[in-house]
Structures are given as structure tokens and as C-alpha cells.
């Protein structure tokens, strides 16, 4: 469905060739944008540190203190329910981890880092507790659901809304890396959630290595957004999250994944998918989309992770900067998908 760049003659650019003035202008613009981002990043972190509206840590959370309102669905490796604690509604995710008490305690310790999470782009965390052979994570309830569900209900995301979603996703990743020192590891539309205030936040990130190991994820669901280096068995890095971001943007913009197979549930379909990710040229947005957006996605989807953009470099790109400046009523858009 996407035009793919072909280079059958193996042409390469001359590294000693002179740079055109237009290229110099573009490079200067990127440098200026990068400086602008760097000068504002401290203010952004300061804003996060002084957030007033965020879930407070609740020390007495346990299974008996929660009233189950309704089942919300299945998350990565666990069931998610809307629950009520006193007058607070929250989303509880229950993950089976087994009967090893040392493992359970280690997971709860690792989750403790979320006490310090103060970002408008990361879903709030009330606390976690062990019950039988499960760990329950109690999080901020986002009443408009995930981008995955919104995409199914509403179709491709409007371009002005998409820009704001990308702004929020990249800022969320930067907060995870710079403040919590966490790599997301499973970035995709189903792990980006929205509320009726128009806030867009990341969830289900890999804060606990042991919990990640305990979660039984299907290989297909994960591999769809997986970077080529991860499929080859390479190390997971920040750049792997950026690849997943690029694939997610294509899906949100077109309501289609770059590689689709009718028999994706069988082993042949999975192998075809993995072959495409590793061997085929990177997917691109169709030419009908704005050039700045297409260049932004291209920067996310270099096969070589050393050439792939970092989160900071993405922030310096013209598309990201332009999306920041556009005023969009996200709350009105999000209210169309509010859960009853």
C-alpha cells in the first residue's frame, strides 16, 4: 500500500560533495530548533516536577479496599478493570506473576519508582499490591480509552490531532528516559491513552524488568511494532522505541499497518511479517500526507539504529515544532470517545 524507495543500482552519495545552500538553510533550521528545545527542556522538567493534578500515592490499597465497577478489557498480559477506592475511580491491571514471594516483592520494589513520576504525558500511578499469585497495578483512569480503540471507532486520526498526539508521545518518551531512566519497550497505539480533558499519556512501559518477564505477551502483537535490530536479537535501546513510534504514526494516520497479512495468526504470516521488517525497505507514508510529517516518520524508520533519530532530534524537526504551535481543542475531540 505504501510507496517504497528502491535503489536497484546501489547508488550512494559522494561524502565529499559540496552542500547546496538550501541544505545549509535546512541544517541551520534544525540546529536552531535543537537549541530552542534544549533551552526549554529544563522548564518542561520543572513544570513536571510541580504538577498539582496527579494521582496521590495510596498506601492502604489492597484487594478488599477496591470495588469493581466493570471490566475494561485485556491489557499486556493481564485483565484491566475500572475500580473504585473510596471516591476515587482508577484502572486496575492484574498480572499473574506466580507464587514466588521473593519475585513478588522485587516487582513491587521496582514499581516504587513510579512514586516519583510527575509528568502530564505519563499515566498516573496510585500504587500496587500483591494478591494471591497476582500483582495489581492501580493507575489513573483515562475515560476515553486507548488510541487503538479510538482508531477502530473513529477511523484515521485527523492531522491536527495527530500532531498533538505525536508531541505528547515524544515528550512522554523523553520524560521516561531523562527522569525515570526507563525504555518503554512496548510503544504502540494500545499503550497510549486519552482522557476527556484531552490529555494524551503513555502507559504499560517497562518500569519493572521482572514484571516484563512475567507478562505473557503474544509474539505477533509485539513484533508488529518491533524494530529490525530487535528481531535480529540485538539490544533494546531508545532507538528501538523510536522505530515503534514511526510504525504507530503510520497506523494512526492511515488506520493500517505497513505490513498486513490475512493469515497473520499462523506461523507463515508471522515469518512473512518478520521478513518484511528486516529485509524490506522501511515503510513510508503516502505522498498525499504533508512533506514535513513524511520526513518525520522517515527519521523514525531508518533500518540502521545509528542513523535513526533520537527523541531530542525529533523535537528539533520542523513538523514537531509546527505541531507545538497549532491550537487544537483536544478535549472536544476526545469527548467523542468518552466511555459511558
UniProtKB/Swiss-Prot annotation:
Keyword Lipid metabolism among UniProt keywords: no
Domain (Protein kinase): residue spans on this chain: 66-320
Enzyme Commission number(s) of this protein: 2.7.12.2
Phosphoserine: residues bearing it: 214
A Pfam family it matches: Pkinase
Subunit structure: Interacts with bob1 and spk1.
Name the UniProt record assigns to this protein: Protein kinase byr1
Naturally occurring in which organism (per UniProt): Schizosaccharomyces pombe (strain 972 / ATCC 24843)
